[in-house]
Amino acid sequence: MSELKDCPLQFHDFKSVDHVKLCPRYTAVLSRSEDDGIGIEELDTLQLELETLLSSASRRLRVLEAETQILTDWQDKKGDRRFLKLGKEHELGTPIKHSKPKKQKLDGKGSHASGPGPGRPKSRIMQQKMQEYEFTDDPVDVPRIPKNDAPNRFWASVEPYCADITNDEIKVLEDLLKTPEDEADYYKIPPLGKHYSQRWAQEDLLEEQKDGARAALSGDKKKGILGPLAELDSKDVDSLLKKSESQHDQPEDGCPFGHLTQRLLQALVEENIISPVEDSPIPEISGKESGTDGASTSPRSQNKPFSAPHTKSLEVRIKEELISQGLLESDDRPADDSEDEVLAELRKRQAELKALSAHNRAKKQELLRLAKEEMNRQELRQRVRMADNEVMDAFRKIMAARQKKRTPTKKEKDQAWKALKERESILKLLDG
């Protein structure tokens, strides 16, 4: 029981923070579901409430660390009761008085003599104890309070957003408004390359050419057989491909003319000008004529498809003439482009990029205008601070004159009125 009474612990009563009263926003956020989330407008209030909880927790932590340190020191020095007694007197503020060794009274003149006697060893023991007490009587080390850097780090992170605008930042905004040199490259449409079937066919022929060249090196016989194929170049490959396409690219109806030429001829030919075959009489053909015609015609000539030269150039000329006469609308781009999904997506993204660039440019111009206005306000605020200093100087001079029990001079009064009027004019400019 005596040890419990001598315990230096204070047993602080920690008061918990009432979250409902002091942190209502924090309590409301905890009661929400995960899908609701936190709004941007709630962040400032949440920050203040979290700082309140942090300060309360750090305060309790410091008190607990102090109690732990006191308990540790008390356990280390628990065996020495006299030290505890001296420690209590030291805590109460009473000066520590060490008892002096009592001198042995001697009768007569020999009282001051330092002769051998039983009191001599006793004084030595007392002095040794006093030195021991003085050595061990150290004040209790005050626990070091942990440094709370959270507010300092917070304000250091916020400072760049609240600091004054400088000329370097204005220059950065002006540089951002300059049109980049490569902006036009983003709106260019690359030319349409070859179709994959043509490209693959050309690659196959080139591969065969390389294989033939390798095979030709192995023997003279193979070289004689594959020699013409090995000597082909890229131009010869293209000519071969065009030739094969022209051979296989025959219209279904066997007509060599283009669709526009056929449509034009169909529009010019009048309908029902030929009588039906059933009503028209069949002319009789003489034997000579039939014989000569039969001899002149052959099955091979009948199976040969009809061909006419310069059909493609005729198609192009007819189209140009119809466009010049206004009978046909000109297309800005080929008809195949409308079916090109890649080109349509590219044009769509380019339009979005152009709209986004215009929006960003407008916002940058607005930001530059606001920054320049804020620079002017900063200069006015600096002038207001200088005017405040002048007003305070004039006020101090007038107060010093009154303390010396003399009336302020006319110069001091005029200086004070001038500073006040100048300050009012600057404030009007700042408010306006």
UniProtKB/Swiss-Prot annotation:
It is found in: Nucleus. Residues 90-124, 275-315 are annotated as: Disordered. One of its GO terms (molecular function) is transcription coactivator activity. It comes from the Eukaryota. Transmembrane segments: none annotated. Signal peptide: none annotated. GO terms for cellular component: nucleus; SAGA complex. InterPro entries: Histone_AcTrfase_su3 (IPR019340). Keywords: Coiled coil, Nucleus, Transcription, Transcription regulation. Functions as a component of the PCAF complex. The PCAF complex is capable of efficiently acetylating histones in a nucleosomal context. Belongs to the NGG1 family. This is Transcriptional adapter 3-B. It comes from Xenopus laevis (African clawed frog).
